Amino acid sequence: MTDTDRQAIYLKYYQEPAYRTSETFLKFDLTDGVTEVTARLRVERSATADADAPLRLEGDDLELISVVVNGTLLSGNQFQRDERSLTLFELPETADITVVTRIYPEQNTALEGLYRSGSMYCTQCEAEGFRRITYYQDRPDVLSRFTTTLVADGDRYPVMLANGNLLTDETLADGRRSVTWHDPFPKPSYLFALV
């Protein structure tokens, strides 16, 4: 998104989100050239939202691999996708949504979302950069607890950090390293960080 694409957002047009994402589980499979991001979201419909309210997830420059709602893989006619969003319809009051995307951090010259700087992967999510990582309610009034797993070559990437407290740090059967962080404090997506 360029500066000319950005539009002013006015308080007088504010609408409460139809859904809240209470828990966010992210897995980053970091390899040279491409990163696969699996985002599992626990969402609840807001008490003031209509029963048929859609869930709109923002996303920029993402390659969508799959969408699963409560264990059911959705086909292309069960959601709507455009350049900047993924919209899900007819959701129950609560849902577990899993979205798998591919991103290309080495090609990310916008320096928003996940990008590569020298030999490190970094994130810049403020103000709307998280939508360049995965489809998400990338707005400051949706607060979620984040659990983040990073999987990469531990020799090449000895520093693997994300928000919160370290839960696990292990070597996988293929020799790669898997590190999981959990942040117990709800926060908006623009405060997400990974290095």
Where do the PLM segments sit?
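Acidic/His-enriched low-complexity segments
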Residues: 1-195
